[in-house]
């Protein structure tokens, strides 16, 4: 009985701790202090996202090395979590450009069911926050996914297509760049090309190489638009 009680208390404690930092603001809080000041000629770019962004630094570290690129991906996160931490992990780092890649975990219902409008609204809200703070915005498509291993009952394809359509239209109407990873990484079944993925959702090193080329082109375009 004592063991069960202790286990129950531990579960309650961990659950309470998680609820206190639902957007996971603590993950980058110390590292963010290094970026409180930016330099005049520094082309700082912050990458906001989930595990697809976070793992980029692991699978292809050379993409970030020697550049003013800051990775602020957090595994498993959904767009409402990102929206809450957007000021702390993006705006407060004083970037010239923010690159947003989000949505697949919303579709996977990691933090509960989400509609196309909920997902796209959150992405658009992040973009508008950046714009209001003088930061140029690159909005990325959700990558293709035929299925989601941790949510096998969900067919992600319809929502992926629908969200991508909404955010692409928004980007075009508001002078922002829409970064289309999807078209370069999709197979004939609307899934992630096998050679580009470590699973049906996450890119591997080869996939990140494709993404890096596309991201560099988009960043160059933004920084040289004038």
Language-model-detected regions and their locations in the chain:
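Catalytic His-Asp segment of secreted/periplasmic serine-dependent ester chemistry enzymes
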Residues: 143-226
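Structural recognition of the beta-strand scaffold that forms the well-ordered cores
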Residues: 45-48, 69-73, 97-102, 137-141, ...
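Charged, glycine-enriched surface loops/patches
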Residues: 116-140, 166-176
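Solvent-exposed loop/turn segments at secondary-structure junctions
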Residues: 51-55, 75-79, 104-109, 143-147, ...
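Serine-esterase "nucleophile elbow" of acetyl-processing enzymes
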Residues: 17-97
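Active-site segments of SGNH/GDSL-like serine hydrolases
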Residues: 101-107, 127-160
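Glycine-rich anion/phosphate-binding loops
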Residues: 77-84, 114-122
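Sec-dependent N-terminal signal peptides
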Residues: 4-13
